[in-house]
UniProtKB/Swiss-Prot annotation:
InterPro entries, per the entry: Aminoacid_DH-like_N_sf, NAD(P)-bd_dom_sf, THF_DH/CycHdrlase, THF_DH/CycHdrlase_cat_dom, THF_DH/CycHdrlase_CS, THF_DH/CycHdrlase_NAD-bd_dom
Molecular functions per Gene Ontology: methenyltetrahydrofolate cyclohydrolase activity; methylenetetrahydrofolate dehydrogenase (NADP+) activity
UniProt xrefs under CDD domains: NAD_bind_m-THF_DH_Cyclohyd
UniProt pathway annotation: One-carbon metabolism; tetrahydrofolate interconversion
Name by which UniProt lists this protein: Bifunctional protein FolD
Species annotation: Paramagnetospirillum magneticum (strain ATCC 700264 / AMB-1) (Magnetospirillum magneticum)
Protein family membership: Belongs to the tetrahydrofolate dehydrogenase/cyclohydrolase family.
E.C. number(s) listed in UniProt: 1.5.1.5, 3.5.4.9
SUBUNIT field: Homodimer.
Keyword annotations: Amino-acid biosynthesis, Histidine biosynthesis, Hydrolase, Methionine biosynthesis, Multifunctional enzyme, NADP, One-carbon metabolism, Oxidoreductase, Purine biosynthesis
One cellular component (GO) term of this entry: cytosol
Catalysed transformations (reactions): (6R)-5,10-methylene-5,6,7,8-tetrahydrofolate + NADP(+) = (6R)-5,10-methenyltetrahydrofolate + NADPH; (6R)-5,10-methenyltetrahydrofolate + H2O = (6R)-10-formyltetrahydrofolate + H(+)
Length: 295
């Protein structure tokens, strides 16, 4: 059997950003409106700093406005909530993202709930979570949305397919399951307590791995020809002391069985920022009561 088709997230996300750039230009020309994304970073976490820099760069590249607010790690919770309140009221800001994790003295849920749901481009606010569950027009979390776009690009219509989502986090697992239900898949949500996890995975046409355990899902768990979306990003140390990024799927064995698979890195990762920009554009159009943006 030949190796699985590689699902190239870099290529797809680049095309999506091109489309977003064109839609932003159209919005500016027709309505004199420029979408704006505000990113708030509290503290000095190195990984978060890289993410924020990349988000800012990509935002500007698409023709949107980028507003960065970098706060010291000891910023009081009230001060952060006041900043969010001012961004909620700012007509030039259409998307608000607070980079997670925040320092321990700040209540993450309180921060999420302080963001105007119409500007919640992470899709974490309970209003957006509820709308997604009810099948309404929600701003959808970026990683599940990116995963869904890759799936639809690879498979076309998803209706009737059996899908397993391994992981039940609020950020990936739960919203991913809701998106697949909306696409008329038959969805199983599996996790650490699932009995016979390999057997459950083996029945699935679509496997979404979002469990946060390096290379946990083995090739012999996968149904031949299945499509595998690996959301995991884990840094492991090799015997020679060097470090390597791997997913939640054992790529070397899975690539020999699956029909299509996302690599790590270069699969789902690049889609996350592209979908953040997509959400910002969608939020901007809705806030200004413009027609829904087509991608």
């Amino acid at each position: 059997m030949t190796d699985a088709k590689l699902i190239d997230g870099n290529l797809f996300s680049a095309k999506l950003r091109e489309t977003i750039t064109a839609r932003v230009a159209e919005m500016k020309a027709a309505h004199h409106i420029t979408p704006g994304l505000a990113v708030v970073l509290v503290g000095e976490d190195p990984a978060s700093q890289v993410y924020v820099r990349t988000k800012g760069k990509r935002t500007v590249e698409t023709g949107m406005r980028s507003f960065e607010h970098k706060l010291p790690a000891d910023t009081p919770e009230d001060a952060l909530l006041l900043l969010i309140e001012s961004l909620n009221k700012d007509p030039e800001v259409h998307g608000i993202l607070v980079q997670l994790p925040v320092p321990k003295h700040i209540d993450t849920q309180k921060v999420i709930e302080a963001i105007d749901p119409a500007k919640d481009v992470d899709g974490f606010h309970p209003v957006n979570v509820g709308r997604l569950a009810a099948g309404g027009d929600a701003l959808v979390p970026c990683t599940p949305l990116g995963s869904l776009l890759l799936l639809k690009d690879t498979l076309g219509k998803l209706g009737g397919l059996d899908a397993v989502v391994i992981g039940r986090s609020n950020i990936v697992g739960k919203p991913m399951a809701q998106l697949l239900i909306k696409e008329s898949c038959t969805v199983t949500v599996a996790h650490s307590q699932t009995k016979d996890l390999p057997g459950v995975v083996r029945r699935a046409d679509i496997v979404i791995a979002a469990v946060g355990r390096p290379e946990m899902i083995k090739g012999d768990w996968i149904k031949p020809g299945a499509t595998v979306i690996d959301v995991g990003i884990n840094r492991i140390e090799l015997p020679d002391g060097t470090k390597k990024l791997v997913g939640d799927v054992d790529f070397a064995s899975a690539v020999k069985v699956a029909g299509a698979i996302t690599p790590v890195p270069g699969g789902v990762g690049p889609m996350t920022i592209a979908c953040l920009l997509r959400n910002t554009l969608v939020a901007c159009a809705r806030l200004h009561k413009l027609p829904e943006v087509e991608f």
